[in-house]
């Protein structure tokens, strides 16, 4: 029997990336070291990483027909990512972002043209055959619709024996009030440093203690904190930690968080413990920060 896939639901965007030797001053002309088009977006990047790690994965998100979408779909396919779940929208444009990556310290500055493209709806998600997937990861975006999607997965799981249940993770990355309702769904909840700080918590350990009451019974809350590594808190009340694994030189942090999330999901889906998954996530994300793009993370 064919192995079930991991499905990532969320954003895909065209990243036009300019790599510079130092961050440009306003109102000056500069040459860049290199420029590339790269498929981006949190869920999209996580698919790239899952595929590179050897997982069978699929992407679900919105695209509008046109040259940009053609490039993105071709790149998904070249990476071995299943795009049969993509929602094709008749209105709006595929989003695009201009990214400045500072080669001297790896910082990334993103200017997103977030177009009028509708997000995937609960109605779109009704068409998904849940039996095809062993894990579904949802990047928090249009949360009120995504809650309905998560409830559909819960209803499906209630009728399944344990080995057939779909495992679920959610990511709460942006400090938007609407997204916070997603805390109470999923067995793994990734909360970002930005959200933790927005809610008044730092460092990661304090965020986990302060926010754990929001997750559902039995869930694990995970918080990565850049060069300080990552922490997790599960139902047993034990705080887990992994140090970061910085590369010899940081050159590109664009997509590092998406790399961490995907690597944790990959490790857990293989039956590893949360401690092992946390360490693996930090290792792969650290390696990615020493590379332009994602090739070479494994």
From Swiss-Prot:
GO molecular function list: ATP binding; ketohexokinase activity
GO biological process: fructose catabolic process; fructose catabolic process to hydroxyacetone phosphate and glyceraldehyde-3-phosphate; fructose metabolic process; glycolytic process through fructose-1-phosphate; regulation of glycogen metabolic process
Record: residues binding beta-D-fructose: 15, 41-42, 45, 258
Pfam families documented for this protein: PfkB
UniProt keywords, alphabetically: ATP-binding, Carbohydrate metabolism, Kinase, Nucleotide-binding, Transferase
Pathway recorded for this protein: Carbohydrate metabolism; fructose metabolism
Any single Gene Ontology cellular-component annotation: cytoplasm
Reactions catalysed: beta-D-fructose + ATP = beta-D-fructose 1-phosphate + ADP + H(+)
Annotated EC: 2.7.1.3
Assembly, per entry: Homodimer.
Job description of the protein: Catalyzes the phosphorylation of the ketose sugar fructose to fructose-1-phosphate.
Family: Belongs to the carbohydrate kinase PfkB family.
Protein name in UniProt: Ketohexokinase
Source organism of the structure: Mus musculus (Mouse)
The gene coding this protein: Khk
């Amino acid at each position: 029997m064919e192995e079930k896939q991991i499905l990532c639901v969320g954003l895909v965007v065209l990243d036009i990336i300019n790599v510079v030797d130092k961050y440009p001053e306003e109102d000056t002309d500069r040459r860049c070291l290199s420029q590339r088009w790269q498929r981006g977006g949190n869920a999209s990047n996580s698919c790239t990483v899952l595929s590179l790690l050897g997982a069978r994965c699929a992407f679900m998100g919105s695209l509008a027909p046109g040259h940009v979408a053609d490039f993105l779909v071709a790149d998904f396919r070249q990476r071995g990512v299943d795009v049969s779940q993509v929602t094709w929208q008749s209105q709006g444009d595929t989003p695009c972002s201009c990214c400045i990556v500072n080669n001297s310290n790896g910082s990334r500055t993103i200017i997103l043209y977030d177009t009028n493209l509708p997000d995937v709806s609960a109605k779109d998600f009704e068409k998904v055959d849940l039996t095809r997937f062993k894990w579904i990861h949802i990047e928090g975006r249009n949360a009120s619709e995504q809650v309905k999607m998560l409830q559909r997965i819960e209803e499906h799981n209630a009728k399944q024996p344990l080995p057939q249940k779909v495992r679920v993770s959610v990511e709460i990355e942006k400090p938007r009030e609407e997204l916070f309702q997603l805390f109470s769904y999923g067995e793994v909840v990734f909360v970002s440093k930005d959200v933790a700080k927005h809610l008044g918590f730092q460092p990661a350990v304090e965020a986990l203690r302060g926010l754990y009451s929001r997750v559902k019974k039995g869930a694990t809350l995970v918080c990565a904190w850049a060069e300080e590594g990552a922490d997790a808190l599960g139902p047993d009340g034990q705080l887990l930690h992994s140090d970061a694994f910085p590369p010899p030189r940081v050159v590109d942090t664009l997509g590092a968080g998406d790399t961490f999330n995907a690597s944790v999901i990959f490790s857990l889906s293989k039956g590893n413990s949360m401690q092992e998954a946390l360490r693996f996530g930090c290792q792969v994300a650290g390696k990615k920060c020493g590379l332009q793009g994602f090739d070479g993370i494994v």
